From Swiss-Prot:
It is found in: Cytoplasm. Its EC number is 1.3.3.3. Transmembrane segments: none annotated. This is Oxygen-dependent coproporphyrinogen-III oxidase. InterPro entries: Coprogen_oxidase_aer (IPR001260), Coprogen_oxidase_aer_sf (IPR036406), Coprogen_oxidase_CS (IPR018375). The gene is hemF. Keywords: Cytoplasm, Heme biosynthesis, Metal-binding, Oxidoreductase, Porphyrin biosynthesis. The record marks H175 as: Important for dimerization. It comes from the Bacteria. Residues 239-274 are annotated as: Important for dimerization. The lineage of its organism: Bacteria, Pseudomonadati, Pseudomonadota, Gammaproteobacteria, Lysobacterales. Pfam families: Coprogen_oxidas. It catalyses: coproporphyrinogen III + O2 + 2 H(+) = protoporphyrinogen IX + 2 CO2 + 2 H2O. The active site is at H106. Pathway: Porphyrin-containing compound metabolism; protoporphyrin-IX biosynthesis; protoporphyrinogen-IX from coproporphyrinogen-III (O2 route): step 1/1.
């Protein structure tokens, strides 16, 4: 089996395993599957769970797409690949829980290959996971980062620190001067040694459930009211802003003629904006700002 097919098989299995775990945790709703094809090449399967007991919306998509010319978002930092044919596969998910005390989360793992005249001229892995709480708890954030650190350990002492820092820098809303959440891991252009880099991608993909599901279980029965729900919807607006303004995956998908419904499944089903909103000083809502700056969560 060639390298691309090995990655593809891993990713489809990862999607299946995460869907099964989410359905078990939710206990009510199930994923609906939407199979699709892309005119220029490839296709995918998008799965959406809606109106569950725990998750308002959980979307997880697998795609395997190809094209004859790299879109600007992919070739801007690799001008030598302009005009190359390409193929990319990946799994991307975003989960929006009902309960404002359960953080929103995102995970993506992907593999990209560029060819010219039938020869592979570049191939690399990318991905990561990050956490976006609205009412954060130190123990949740520390657990999240402990899992991230542990899965990075076999890949070198500097791996966690470097990819945590990359995550903090990437998921930053410059126009708001705040991070999207409390970070996690982010990496791209990992393509020096296939077996080593593929093993890391699998560690990240497999580690996601270990990082997230204990937080879901811990917070899913926390009581909340209209105040918390309104703040959750307001903060979801930041998620929308980041994904539509900065996110490279969203831009790549739209610029490459991808399926808009699948690309935009990351957006929350309900969201609101409020002009000039300022949380009451000393409130739980105001406390969130202390978490939206890069910091060492593991001491």
């Amino acid at each position: 089996m060639n390298e691309f097919d090995r990655v593809r098989d891993y990713l489809t299995d990862l999607q299946d395993r995460i869907c099964a775990a989410v359905e078990a945790a939710d206990g009510k709703a199930r994923f609906a599957e939407d199979l699709w094809k892309r005119e220029e090449g490839g296709g995918g399967r998008t799965r959406i769970l809606r109106d569950g007991a725990v998750f308002e919306q959980a979307g997880i998509g697998f795609s395997d797409v190809s094209g004859t010319r790299l879109p600007p978002s992919a070739s801007a930092h690799r001008p030598e690949l302009a005009g190359a044919t390409w193929r990319a596969c990946g799994v991307s998910l975003v989960f929006h829980p009902h309960n404002p005390y359960i953080p929103t989360t995102h995970m993506n793992v992907r593999y990209f290959r560029a060819e010219r005249d039938g020869e592979v001229v570049a191939a690399w892995f990318g991905g990561g996971f990050d956490l976006t709480p609205f009412y954060p708890f130190d123990e949740d954030v520390q657990h999240w980062h402990r899992v991230a650190q542990a899965l990075c350990e076999p890949f070198g002492e500097e791996r966690y620190a470097a990819h945590k820092r990359w995550c903090d820098e990437y998921f930053f809303l410059r126009h708001r001067n705040e991070t999207r959440g409390v970070g996690g891991l982010f990496f791209d252009d990992l393509g020096k040694e296939f077996e080593h880099d593929f093993a890391y991608q699998q560690a990240v993909g497999n580690g996601f459930l270990d990082a997230y599901m204990p937080i879901v279980q811990r917070r899913k029965d926390t009581a909340y009211g209209e105040r918390e729900r309104e703040f959750q919807l307001y903060r979801r607006g930041r998620y929308v802003e980041f994904n539509l303004v900065y996110d490279r995956g969203t831009l790549f998908g739209l610029q490459s003629g991808g399926r808009a419904e699948s690309i935009l499944m990351s957006l929350p089903p309900r969201v609101r904006w409020e002009y000039g909103f300022t949380p009451e000083p000393g409130s739980a809502e105001a406390r969130l700002a202390d978490y939206l700056i890069p910091r060492d969560w593991l001491g």
